[in-house]
Amino acid sequence: MHKVFASDFFNFEFLRLLGTVPFQGAEVGECLTTAGRIKDGDPESWYRAWRDQAEKAQALAEEAAAVGDRTGACWAYIRAANYWRASEFLLHCTPNDPRILAASKASVNAFDKGWVLLDATVKSFEIPYDKDIKLPGRLYLPAPHHRLPGKIPVVLQTGGFDSTQEELYFYGAAGALPRGYAVFSFDGPGQGLPLRVGKLKLRTDWEYVVSQVLDFVTDDIAPEYDLDLERLAIFGASLGGYLSLRAAVDPRIKACISCDGPLDLFEITRSRMPSWFINGWLSGWVSDGLFNWVVDALTAVNFQIAWEFGHGKWVFGVETPADVLRVMQQISLKGGYLSKIKCPTLITGAADSFYFTPDINANPIFEGLTALGSNEKHLWIGKGVEGGGLQAKIGALAVVHHKMFTWLDSTFAIKRDVL
């Protein structure tokens, strides 16, 4: 695979943007020009370059809107939203940096201006969560000429460790709408604005979060918008793949797509550390103080490690690297949890992932679905960047759309004419 950046981390995040080009999330020329302004491994240059490109895309959107170019304005606003999202992404080592919230709000604002111009109906909602807390959600409905017969099948889309609801559009709604599916996406605790504004931390029992969202969808949304609750699926990618499996035990979910999710987040992190060091910490031989000192020393020379632990502390609401690992120990599907899933399930893996390799994730997850027959569960391992081999199918979103909706069509008995 050709690399734009020598750093695997920077290259992956660049491809994350570039991969949205087919769905108006970026322009190739804009991305290549922006990449030329970034110093590999330097998050400040990354922020400045994508901020500048976001401003340029937003200016193009406003120029198009001023002359009545609906399509041009829509596409440019959506690109601007994605560039704003990317700009603040590598600043998460210091969550109190005011640029994070400013760029996040700019991303949401640009996306809100873009979706009203889509060839679809999009509605924004506030989902009752806990007490007076509400979560942001969006319902995407297919245009009349894309409608399938009967009620509208719907995909409930959950984010993951570092996504925002605006980015989820490219993974879900962009592929669902022209195929006649509705999508309901949301940002939960530890994600998007609930993290940045509400300071809500990620919950490891994500099934609780989704139960609140499902209450809202089934009671308030489905009747008004003709959603088919007998054809309701959940979809999540990367950590979202894990979260979707946590939620799939709810009987209201009729199908689950878990894209490249982990089986046990702590065991994955453990496998990337020297065994004597992590085992010493687990046994108490290595103290928290020493563990934290070593990790902090590594973050000074390895930006990827710095970002992963910095973002982890923020999302999990903890103060030290040792505490990050303690939360990770709770993020596991072991112990029989997978046997509780009764709905048809598609598991995907990424053969070339440097995060969640299939041998210790997708494969054992698939085998753990013991309540499902061979015709109720399916495993797909993507290979190569062009075939969905990178984590979360980065660079192959059209491929994952095809695989996912072909499987959902079969699961929900949706028939289409041969072309």
Swiss-Prot record:
The active site is at 238. One of its GO terms (molecular function) is hydrolase activity. Its EC number is 3.7.1.-. The keyword Hydrolase applies. Pfam families: FrsA-like. InterPro entries: AB_hydrolase_fold, FrsA-like, FrsA_esterase. The keyword Hydrolase applies. Pathway: Mycotoxin biosynthesis. It comes from the Eukaryota. Belongs to the AB hydrolase superfamily. FUS2 hydrolase family. 20-hydroxy-prefusarin hydrolase; part of the gene cluster that mediates the biosynthesis of the mycotoxin fusarin C. Within the cluster, FUS1, FUS2, FUS8 and FUS9 are sufficient for fusarin production. The roles of the other FUS members are yet undetermined. The fusarin C synthetase FUS1 is responsible for the condensation of one acetyl-coenzyme A (CoA) unit with six malonyl-CoA units and the amide linkage of the arising heptaketide and homoserine, subsequently releasing the first intermediate, prefusarin, as an alcohol with an open ring structure. This is 20-hydroxy-prefusarin hydrolase FUS2. It comes from Gibberella moniliformis (strain M3125 / FGSC 7600). The gene is FUS2.
